[in-house]
Amino acid sequence: MQEAALLVLCYLLGSIPFSYFFTRMLTRQDIRKRGSGNVGATNVFRTSGPGVALLAFLGDLLKGLLAAWIGQSTGSQLLLVICVILAVIGHIYPVFLGFKGGKGVTTSAGIILFLMPDVTGILLLIFLAIVYFTRYVSLGSITVACLLPLVSLAMGKPWSYVVIGILMAALVVYHHRENIDRLRNGSEAKITDKA
């Protein structure tokens, strides 16, 4: 019973739509009706500016950190995997917004930061380099998501961490399908483009 409650808690934690809340509170706008319509920090940055985006980013990052801490505290590697993936699923399919949320990148980053700070550092450098040279946040997100399980495996992380990396990569890439199509045809918005 206690384990089930923790799993529900992790999903609900992931479901807290910080991008929506901060945009609504500070700009009185509905992020779902602005820019790409995505409930994530990148869309907040492009539509509401860096200040609001930073708050949204930190909120989503914190969700991942807390979910990883909860999962780790159970002492079970299986429960850890389920807890953190439920948090990411909660972010993507939030009960509080009719199951239409973000793409799971920042919440995943919070989880990896808690579990594997060394891997996070490597992937962050790669992400920043890609975004700096291409101005495509989506390309950076997709690339580091794909690299996550490979880097985790190469650095000898526990099997549960590698599984988490594989599942996160699958979720992130799947929910970037439209971005991938736009990258291919050259219509993807850059971080410097205003919505």
From Swiss-Prot:
Record GO terms (molecular function): acyl-phosphate glycerol-3-phosphate acyltransferase activity
Signal peptide: none
Segments passing through the bilayer: 3-23, 51-71, 79-99, 111-131, 153-173
Pathway stated in the Swiss-Prot or TrEMBL entry: Lipid metabolism; phospholipid metabolism
Catalytic activity of the protein: an acyl phosphate + sn-glycerol 3-phosphate = a 1-acyl-sn-glycero-3-phosphate + phosphate
Predominant place of localization: membrane
Superkingdom of the source species: Bacteria
Compartments where found: Cell membrane
Family named by the database record: Belongs to the PlsY family.
Function: Catalyzes the transfer of an acyl group from acyl-phosphate (acyl-PO(4)) to glycerol-3-phosphate (G3P) to form lysophosphatidic acid (LPA). This enzyme utilizes acyl-phosphate as fatty acyl donor, but not acyl-CoA or acyl-ACP.
NCBIfam families: glycerol-3-phosphate 1-O-acyltransferase PlsY
Stated name of the protein: Glycerol-3-phosphate acyltransferase
Gene that specifies this protein: plsY
